[in-house]
């Protein structure tokens, strides 16, 4: 498996300079990826939160090898054209190292309801499906005429295209027993299972394999809770491991400077 550091850009790590320091330490230590949360609020009490796209741009400039990206961006609260522009620019800035993690988002910190965003899960799912489809169409560089229930692109051409072709890799979050998010992920390039045990991951991957015919070329980015689960997930075919320190962890830089397999 490849190993990625998943950084909560909050508290002391809401400073992009601190995030760059962590990312460069991780690259030097042999990590394969550096990803960041995409939240606008976090926790019930006020806390500093960095913008993920500004942070990722800084990380892209400071690093040369690691894959980078958000894990995950709630597409339901973003305009697809704005996200298309941001992702293509970041893909060029990083020389084709961007992976885009997408999901429904959560409202536990009122980062949806607090700003009048859509909260209804069904509607968020519809917006996620439409938004992902529209993103891929805009990345194509072709003139598109898209009319969905939630988004419209009226005979427009969006350039430049991403460095990566046929598209920037799309990984989708999926939680627990929900089957629709797994099938959604199977239509794209990867899955980020959230809070799953070994049996649940096996069930998810069975769905993916049934949908795709094979797991070949499909990324599975897991967050194991320890060495035993790490090995079990690897046996099931996981391709990436996320190591996610606690938000504001003062030892984050030390973790980043550690050879990742030794953490398990």
In which residue ranges do the predicted regions lie?
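Active-site-adjacent structural elements that line small-molecule/cofactor binding pockets in enzymes
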Residues: 1-264
């Amino acid at each position: 498996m490849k190993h990625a550091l998943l950084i909560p850009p909050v508290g002391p790590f809401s400073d992009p300079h601190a995030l760059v320091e962590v990312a460069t330490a991780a690259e030097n230590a042999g990590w394969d990826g550096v990803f960041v949360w995409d939240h606008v609020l976090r926790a019930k009490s006020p806390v500093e939160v960095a913008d993920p796209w500004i942070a990722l741009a800084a990380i892209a400039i400071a690093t040369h090898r690691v894959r980078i990206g958000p894990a995950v961006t709630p597409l339901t609260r973003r305009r697809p054209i704005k996200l298309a522009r941001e992702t293509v620019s970041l893909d060029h800035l990083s020389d084709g190292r961007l992976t885009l993690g997408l999901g429904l988002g959560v409202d536990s910190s009122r980062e949806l309801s607090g700003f009048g965003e859509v909260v209804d899960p069904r509607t968020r799912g519809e917006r996620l499906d439409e938004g992902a489809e529209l993103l891929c169409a805009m990345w194509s560089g072709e003139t598109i005429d898209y009319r969905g229930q939630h988004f419209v692109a009226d005979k427009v051409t969006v350039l430049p295209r991403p460095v990566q072709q046929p598209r920037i890799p799309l990984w989708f979050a999926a939680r627990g027993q929900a089957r629709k998010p797994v099938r959604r992920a199977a239509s794209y390039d990867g899955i980020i299972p959230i809070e799953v045990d070994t049996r649940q991951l096996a069930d998810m991957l069975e769905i993916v394999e049934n949908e795709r015919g094979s797991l070949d070329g499909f990324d599975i980015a897991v967050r194991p809770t320890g060495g035993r689960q790490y090995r079990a997930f690897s046996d099931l075919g996981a391709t990436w491991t996320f190591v996610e320190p606690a938000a504001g962890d003062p030892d984050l830089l030390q973790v980043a400077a550690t050879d990742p397999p030794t953490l398990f």
